[in-house]
From Swiss-Prot:
InterPro entries: RA_dom, RIN2_SH2, SH2, SH2_dom_sf, Ubiquitin-like_domsf, VPS9, Vps9-like, VPS9_dom_sf. It is found in: Cytoplasm. Coiled coil: none annotated. This is Ras and Rab interactor 2. PANTHER family: RAB GDP/GTP EXCHANGE FACTOR (PTHR23101), RAS AND RAB INTERACTOR 2 (PTHR23101:SF51). Residues 318-338 have a biased composition (Polar residues). It holds the Pfam family VPS9. It comes from Mus musculus. Residues 97-190 form the SH2 domain. Its main location: cytoplasm. GO terms for cellular component: cytoplasm. Belongs to the RIN (Ras interaction/interference) family. Residues 627-766 form the VPS9 domain. The keyword Cytoplasm applies.
Amino acid sequence: MSAWTMGAQGLDKRGSFFKLIDTIASEIGELKREMVQTDISRENGLEPSETHSMVRHKDGGYSEDKDGKTCPRDSGYDSLSNRLSILDRLLHTHPIWLQLSLSEEEAAEVLQAQPPGIFLVRKSSKMQKKVLSLRLPCEFGAPLKEFTIKESTYTFSLEGSGISFADLFRLIAFYCISRDVLPFTLKLPYAISTAKTESQLEELAQLGLNFWSSSADNKPLNSPPPHRPLPSAGICPASLRQLCLINGVHSIKTRTPSELECSQTNGALCFINPLFLKVHSQDLSTGPKRPSTRTPNANGTERPRSPPPRPPPPAINSLHTSPGLSRTEPQTSMPETVNHSKHGNVALLGTKPTPIPPPRLKKQASFLEAESSAKTLTARRPSRRSEPEPELELELEMGTAGHAGGAPPRDAPGDCTRAPPPGSESQPPPCHGARQRLSDMSLSTSSSDSLEFDRSMPLYGYEADTTSSLEDYEGESDQETMAPPIKSKKKRNSSFVLPKLVKSQLRKMSGVFSSFMTPEKRMVRRIAELSRDKCTYFGCLVQDYVSFLKENKECHVSSTDMLQTIRQFMTQVKNYLSQSSELDPPIESLIPEDQIDVVLEKAMHKCILKPLKGHVEAMLKDFHTADGSWKQLKENLQLVRQRNPQELGVFAPTPDLMELEKIKLKFMTMQKMYSPEKKVMLLLRVCKLIYTVMENNSGRMYGADDFLPVLTYVIAQCDMLELDTEIEYMMELLDPSLLHGEGGYYLTSAYGALSLIKNFQEEQAARLLSSEARDTLRQWHKRRTTNRTIPSVDDFQNYLRVAFQEVNSGCTGKTLLVRPYITTEDVCQLCAEKFKVEDPEEYSLFLFVDETWQQLAEDTYPQKIKAELHSRPQPHIFHFVYKRIKSDPYGVIFQNGEDLTPS
């Protein structure tokens, strides 16, 4: 057995997600077969009105068969015809099922009258976490069960599950089609699952919580399970069979790519897993050749059916406008690409832009089609595919569901050739599975769109600098104001010339990349758009303040007063926005709670500081020019530059001219930014570069006492007066929670270096800060921390020091990462793992304070207790101790003079 096959088996054992993918793929393939009845009936000489038509007319209705009979069908089948995926329905109706303020008793009262499978998402007051409340059948005993939703850095997942999602909507959409850790899949209310249009969903959403007690959801509790309509015997081939239902899931056969018909438009829509492409490519090359499909013509004779003509490349503005376009042409058949290509509607799926990115597959297909126009349409053997790297295995496993068929064209089994002439019956057309599937999937309206993951699909043709986090950090917000970074280009000798069409598509790829934004960036953009809308209270608040500040230049007496006022306004607006209902969907559904403040701070930078950047710079310059501080600084900069480094107290190696030019370029880049947080990031890079020069040229480590004179020397050599206002800008506008880390330390160092230059005198060595500069720093620190009576968890970096007491081994301690919503029960589980306790049920977490012991209850929050103890006027020495419950209450923790560092 080859190593690749063994690796594939290993992946298959732990990749249960792949089985789900194959199931969904075959399911969609069967659905597509059932939905081509109109096309088949025409070939058999039948009128469309004699079939079970799924044709959507302009009036939004659906035609029935001749008898007027209709068959019930499930909501997933309706989603295919209505182009409303599960994710669309969840997004439009979140005021119904997303009830974060609902109590446990109220949720139970709502779900008691609902059929099994109906759900709510609320926030538990006990755990301070979001929970999924699920209605259970009677045989489960309890009518309701709650599943905890875990929130990590920008991801959501259910407790006990290994699958994470970018936001709450995608999590719920996934569990509507797969149960994973749930006892069964979630079920949408009857009115939501049967709604035909977005306007109907919006009408339901306006009811909010009252939906559950209204007559809108009037499906009987014991109604039979819906099923899909049976295809007519005279219309559908014998291979189309009624699918059996097992627990609501169709029992279907999983097939390999070699078994799938991929040369016809009505072939099964499939997901080809790139991990097993090499294995199945052998089946494609050695398997039996299929005869060309034949269809009867008007005379009754058979003629070979040709593959459909390739759709033309998308319109020039299709990549930018497709998410917002509406459908205006009647759709005759789902897999039919000819009519769609004539009207330029190849890649249109959605009818209304939503806060989530549009489906990626249609854009990927559009780009691949444009790329393929430059290549000769000839069949070729499948290229070798290297084994995926270990760090990419999880990404492939998670991304295959939402982005199947998204592999590069060269990894596909082969390319389709043009239609053979009628005489060439014996030679079947070569098959191009991936290309055909991309074309079909661009027209697919299946609910699998809800499985798209933002960060799992690779960006082909996009080169990102992953060696530094700053490039990612500077990404979207400053692209309008920053000059493009200079990157080294490698000269490549190639005789291949890209056609103009491909070049045009490559230029528009930036529009495609916007669909890959993380929920954080989407929320920042949403808040920025809201700030420009004066129809909202938040927009009026921001626009009025920006206009007032620009029109009233005399309202501030100093630069510090102006910056403090802006910072105070940002804090107030951020607090309002965190409790406002103007954000739709709510920020809690897209961003984990411990990251909400960070995202709101970035949004404040974009919607307040960005429009004020030019005004603030001009005002700072006017203030410092009027008080004469810049004139004095300019003279002192010239004086310091004339001194030797040793006269400035520099006894470490200094940067050379080339390195000074790099530092000056970073300072110039800093001036173009409006975010104080990003300015600090660049300042940290400058300080890191200086430290690197000092250590590399001497071979020894240096401390802060040696660094400050070198930083003073570097600032003087850069000769930039604007650094004075840049440092003041950062010190006053930076979020106070960021002043306690590395950024605050080096920001203070830069302020001290400038103060040395401002107060430089010939008769004294510039080694010590003046008393005036020290007083300024003390006042600044006091001002930034006055209003923070109770320290937030960010002050302590989410760390908790826990001591572990054993009678035999004494006392040891560990620093654990404990977030604010982590309960004592969770901390005890973490301690049991860290300290390797064999019987954790006999241990608990205790608080030792004021010579007394107190066992903490399981539902308490150690970080909140820690914050309260730190905020007391008179500090108390306290310790968190993990020890046996039945032991000496005083123990030996502080015997023999041993003391632990306070938490």
